Amino acid sequence: MLDHFNRKENASTGNLIIQGEQGCGKTMLATSFIKVLQKDGEQLTGKMGKIDAAALNKKDVQQVVRKITGGCLIIERAGDIDRSIAAKLSFLMEHDITGTLYILEDTSKGIKKALSMDEGFASKFTEKISVPIFTNDELVLFAKSYSAELGYKIDEMAILALHNRISNIERIDQATTLTEVKDIIDEAIDREAHSGLKKAISILTAKRYTDDDRIVLKEDHFREK
């Protein structure tokens, strides 16, 4: 990856593949990764753009690349990319000397399909991150982190309720995803915001907030409908 930025010749190497099951957090991972590079200030100096491969097929690829010059282009559901678009993008990458980073996102099957569209295109994606299947404890840690980013804290009893919610959506043939956990948190936040009388009482008794002014999510907010 560092070679991609150090060479400054073109975007013919060091581009990234992020693969994993649907809803596993590929886009969140890619976005966080790009923010780190942008914060450093020396690698990515341009804008970040995200586009679905099916939508990219209908665009002027050169114009899309021009908009994110020196930044990053994330192509979601990369397996839907057309052969002609992959070839055009490969050509543009060979002549891109601005340090632009290109990221493909999809399941392993989708990535394999995308790379089969054009040999030159495939050769430019030399780095890969495979998003793992998360345990329930890891999903809860994600939920706590996601809540904190939004200004909330999950109390101890609510953590138990969250564990139950996650267990209840487990499937034998498919791992529980970060997207599903995110939806549970979003639902809890919505319930907290519309809890009426209980909310008014908690505000008056100062039980709604932590010492660092985060809103507390309680057990009731995680109960299934």
Question: Which functions belong to the PLM regions below?
Answer:
Residues 52-55, 65-85, 94:
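Conserved P-loop NTPase "ATPase switch" module shared by AAA+ and STAND
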Residues 146-153, 160-225:
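C-terminal alpha-helical "lid" subdomain
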Residues 36-68:
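AAA+/P-loop NTPase substrate/partner-engagement loops
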Residues 13-45:
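Walker A/P-loop
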Residues 74-76, 100-108:
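Structural recognition of the conserved hydrophobic beta-strand(s) that form the central parallel beta-sheet
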Residues 24, 55-57, 79-81, 107-112, ...:
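Conserved nucleotide-binding/hydrolysis micro-motifs of P-loop NTPases
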Residues 1-14:
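Pre-Walker A (pre-P-loop) alpha-helix and adjacent loop at the N terminus of AAA/AAA+ ATPase modules
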Residues 116-133:
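A short helix-turn-beta junction within AAA+ P-loop NTPase domains corresponding to the substrate/partner-engaging
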